[in-house]
Amino acid sequence: MTATPGLRFPLGATPLAAGTNFAVASSVAEGLELCLFDAAGEKARIPFLDVDAGVWHAFVPDVGPGQAYGLRATGPYRPADGIRCNPAKLLLDPYARAIHGDVTFGPEVLGYDPDRPDAPSSLDSASHVPRSLVVDPAFDWGTDVPRHRRLADSIVYELHVKGFTMAHPDVPPELRGTYAGLAHEAATSHLVDLGVTAVELLPVHRSVPEAFLVERGLTNYWGYNTIGFFAPHEGYSAAARAGDPLGAVREFKAMVLALHQAG
């Protein structure tokens, strides 16, 4: 599988008619590789051959929504300067719209050699970290438009998607703790009855629990340990729980639409 130069904007993975454009910003990498995965593991490794103004870009034919991918960077390793290029480590796309999988904590995910902290680790991390996913951005928003409500006329309610929906008795049990639960009429009607005009959600972007919590069989309830700001957290998606990782994106958008329709 080979790539053509592609475009340096927009950043991230953009599916097009005949393939997907990948654009990744790095001002320090001397080389960047795109790794494609299937259920059996890594199936292809494609070098980015073009870089403009610090953005590496490539168009890969016959790659579409749902494709799992990661990145590997070669270049300087100078931890004291905050530079840690290490091709043994599979990286997430910082602009990924979906991220699937969990971190398996161990020496493989460390960028450094535990026996020589100033040296890079040679252990491959691919089987221990999540993958980025190519996402189709299409969604039917209907006639939805921004409300442009004055702040003086607004009542903003801060809520936690899981906590709010888990505690609501009229949200169906199978939807509690999810975006679909917050989109349910029982949840939106409750907010309207309170006079709420906007919700401010506690972290809904993709996060992972810290290692010390995992060791204790716990998780991070609040979600501030972010690994991807543009990808919705899978753990709050009924669709992802049912085995559809891309469904988390659609479910999140449907939640936003339902909240807007409720006023």
Model-derived features with residue positions:
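Structural beta-strand segments of beta-rich domains
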Residues: 18-22
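Aromatic- and acidic-residue-enriched carbohydrate-binding clefts of CAZyme catalytic domains
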Residues: 171-181, 211-261
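Short proline/glycine-enriched turn/loop motifs at strand-loop junctions of beta-rich domains
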Residues: 25-32, 63-64
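Loop/turn elements at helix/coil->beta-strand transitions in domains of secreted/extracellular proteins
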Residues: 154, 194-199, 261-263
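The feature marks proteins involved in alpha-glucan
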Residues: 1-16, 42-43, 51-55, 62-158, ...
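Conserved, mostly hydrophobic/aromatic
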Residues: 24, 71, 159, 191, ...
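Carboxylate/His-rich catalytic cores and anion/metal-binding grooves
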Residues: 191-218
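A conserved hydrophobic secondary-structure block that centers on an alpha-helix together
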Residues: 162-199
